[in-house]
């Protein structure tokens, strides 16, 4: 199958490309820059130049493939306008999905467990409503297209980690270094799910190959961690001696986007993906990666 992957040189996108090609699929990778295009060409990946700010460029990529896996996310600076960011994302998704109507082609959207809001202490399954305005419009658009001849699928990742990278984990490290200790919000009792990079790449491929239209899948490894415990492990890995720092809930803006991620509980069930797709996440745990793996100091 020929798959158009947006964000093909990003953290998750690059792992998906590697998994797809390893399984015999052909990838058309979207590149925003000459640098990204060169990275794809070095790996033998066909390049399609495009970007979120130019929806028509993404439509052209979608038309050239049998399936689309959308992982691209806008680049964010310190003065980012989130309303404009959201508009750009929803416009690009809508354009691609509309171009696929009546084709029975596959469109896989990267959403996120953050769409559930605060899950509390119980792991939620995919029947839980998506309420966050950052996630709901795109999910509604993509899922609604199932009735119009699009094989729509949604993946809802939690915190992705591995290989000493990850936007979320590295932001957590950077904030902790700035604050002089592993950062958590409030009492640090918010709960979180997470998933190793190779495992989420495998999930995307299995969804591409096996899923029925109109299905969503949570992406995690089944473990549940307190954010304070993770913050302490990050402190050790960052050479901060295990010291931790609490940011009060009413000052969560000091933590930037990472504060919104770790300030409330986001725990999910993965039984559906395991049952329907025969998916079995098997990578090292986040705590192992922090203590002795790719993030260890």
Place the predicted regions along the sequence by residue.
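Mid/C-terminal beta-alpha module of Rossmann-like enzyme folds, strongest
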Residues: 2, 203-258
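N-terminal Rossmann NAD(P)H-binding glycine-rich loop of SDR-like oxidoreductase domains
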Residues: 3-23
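Conserved Rossmann-fold NAD(P)-dependent oxidoreductase catalytic core, especially the SDR/UDP-sugar
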Residues: 28, 88-133
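NAD(P)H-binding glycine-rich loop region in Rossmannoid oxidoreductase-like domains
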Residues: 29-94, 98
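Alpha-helical substrate-binding/gating segment
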Residues: 173-182, 190-224
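Conserved C-terminal active-site "lid" loop/helix of NAD(P)H-dependent oxidoreductases
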Residues: 252-280
């Amino acid at each position: 199958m020929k798959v158009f992957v947006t964000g093909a040189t990003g953290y998750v996108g690059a792992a998906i490309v590697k998994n797809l090609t390893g399984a015999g699929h052909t990838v058309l990778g979207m590149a925003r820059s000459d640098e990204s295009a060169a990275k794809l060409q070095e790996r033998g990946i066909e390049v399609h130049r495009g970007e979120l700010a130019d929806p028509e460029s993404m439509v052209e990529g979608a038309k050239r493939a049998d399936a689309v896996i959308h992982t691209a996310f806008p680049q964010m600076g310190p003065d980012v306008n989130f309303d404009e960011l959201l508009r750009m994302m929803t416009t690009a998704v809508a354009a691609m999905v509309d171009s696929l109507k009546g084709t029975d082609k596959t469109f896989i959207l990267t959403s996120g467990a953050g769409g559930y809001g605060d899950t509390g202490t119980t792991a939620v399954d995919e029947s839980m409503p998506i309420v966050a305005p950052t996630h709901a419009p795109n999910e509604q658009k993509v899922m609604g297209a199932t009735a119009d001849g699009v094989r729509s699928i949604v993946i809802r990742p939690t915190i992705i980690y591995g290989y000493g990278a990850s936007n979320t984990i590295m932001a957590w490290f950077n904030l902790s270094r700035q604050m002089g200790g592993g950062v958590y919000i409030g009492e640090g009792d918010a709960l979180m799910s997470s998933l190793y990079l190779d495992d989420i790449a495998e999930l995307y491929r299995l969804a591409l190959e096996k899923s029925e239209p109109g299905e969503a899948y949570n992406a995690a490894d089944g473990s549940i961690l307190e954010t304070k415990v993770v913050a302490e492990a990050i402190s050790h890995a960052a050479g901060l001696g295990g010291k931790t720092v609490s940011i009060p809930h009413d000052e969560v803006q000091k933590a930037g986007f990472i504060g919104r991620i770790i300030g409330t509980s986001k725990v999910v069930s993965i039984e559906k993906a395991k049952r329907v797709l025969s998916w079995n996440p098997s990578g090292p745990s986040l705590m192992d990666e922090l203590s002795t793996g790719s993030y260890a100091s």
